[in-house]
């Protein structure tokens, strides 16, 4: 796709939205990041607790877990808070488990010691790709948190073994495109979320045919596109952490 008008956003097929990572966004959490993928904005915080879940007692290793939520008016119409409904949706549970799995893939939990790193991802504005933005921002928040643990002498070394980031790809108008916004996500034939490490290893691939089935050739093209996009996201993570 060379004609940018084929995408509602006017972007090239292989072009990310404008991605911004703002560290130290709030003052209380050990790590706090505002991550923006275009009009999708997520606050990601990392908090350290000197305890572990019951199933890890006496093992000496740590744990990392995540929670995810959306503000009532993060979308076009208001939705009730899940706390008011008294129950999390299946979507919320799925996304927060994904965030936790993604981050644990690049953590040495033994090096973290007997403590828990809580990652909270709160969507303040949604325009597609909230889970991928959450993973990308949560990594930076987690990095800041463990850097403080090392500096304070609470752990001997960083438990982080690699970078991790995530991006969406999809078949839109018969063409593989990168980083779908809401308009594209709502109209695409295939929607795929890809999580990868900085070294290029796959952590998770979630792909669904929303319309027409996709071929192996199309899947390979989508994965290639995702890999290139995640490489750019990792570069942005590094730049943010070095700033």
Curated annotation (Swiss-Prot):
One of its GO terms (biological process) is rRNA catabolic process. Phosphate binds at residues 91, 129-131. Keywords: Nucleotidyltransferase, RNA-binding, rRNA processing, Transferase, tRNA processing, tRNA-binding. InterPro entries: ExoRNase_PH_dom1, ExoRNase_PH_dom2, ExoRNase_PH_dom2_sf, PNPase/RNase_PH_dom_sf, Ribosomal_Su5_D2-typ_SF, RNase_PH, RNase_PH_bac-type, RNase_PH_CS. The keyword rRNA processing applies. GO terms for molecular function: 3'-5'-RNA exonuclease activity; tRNA binding; tRNA nucleotidyltransferase activity. It is an enzyme of class 2 (transferase). Coiled coil: none annotated. NCBIfam families: RNasePH (TIGR01966). Belongs to the RNase PH family. Homohexameric ring arranged as a trimer of dimers. Phosphorolytic 3'-5' exoribonuclease that plays an important role in tRNA 3'-end maturation. Removes nucleotide residues following the 3'-CCA terminus of tRNAs; can also add nucleotides to the ends of RNA molecules by using nucleoside diphosphates as substrates, but this may not be physiologically important. Probably plays a role in initiation of 16S rRNA degradation (leading to ribosome degradation) during starvation. This is Ribonuclease PH. It comes from Burkholderia pseudomallei (strain 668). The lineage of its organism: Bacteria, Pseudomonadati, Pseudomonadota, Betaproteobacteria, Burkholderiales.
């Amino acid at each position: 796709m060379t004609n940018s008008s084929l995408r509602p956003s006017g972007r090239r097929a292989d072009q990310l939205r404008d991605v911004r990572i703002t560290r130290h966004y709030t003052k209380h959490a050990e790590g706090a990041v505002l991550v923006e993928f275009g009009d999708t904005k997520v606050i990601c915080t990392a908090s350290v607790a000197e305890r572990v879940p019951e199933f890890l007692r006496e093992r000496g290793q740590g744990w990392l877990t995540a929670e995810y939520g959306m503000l009532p008016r993060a979308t076009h119409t208001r939705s009730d808070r899940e706390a008011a409904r008294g129950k999390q949706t299946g979507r919320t549970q799925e996304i927060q488990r994904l965030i936790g799995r993604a981050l644990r893939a690049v953590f040495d939990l033994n090096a973290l010691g007997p403590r828990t790193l809580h990652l909270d991802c709160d969507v303040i504005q949604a325009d597609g790709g909230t889970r991928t933005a959450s993973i990308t921002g949560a990594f930076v928040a987690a990095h800041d948190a463990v850097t403080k643990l090392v500096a304070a002498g609470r752990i001997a070394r960083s438990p982080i073994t690699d970078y991790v980031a995530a991006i969406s790809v999809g078949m839109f108008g018969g063409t593989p495109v990168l980083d779908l916004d809401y308009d594209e996500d709502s109209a695409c034939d295939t929607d795929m979320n890809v999580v990868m490490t900085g070294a290029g290893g796959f952590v998770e691939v979630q792909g669904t045919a929303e319309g027409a089935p996709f071929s192996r050739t199309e899947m390979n093209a989508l994965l290639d596109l995702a890999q290139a996009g995640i490489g750019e996201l990792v570069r942005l993570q590094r730049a943010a952490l070095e700033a």
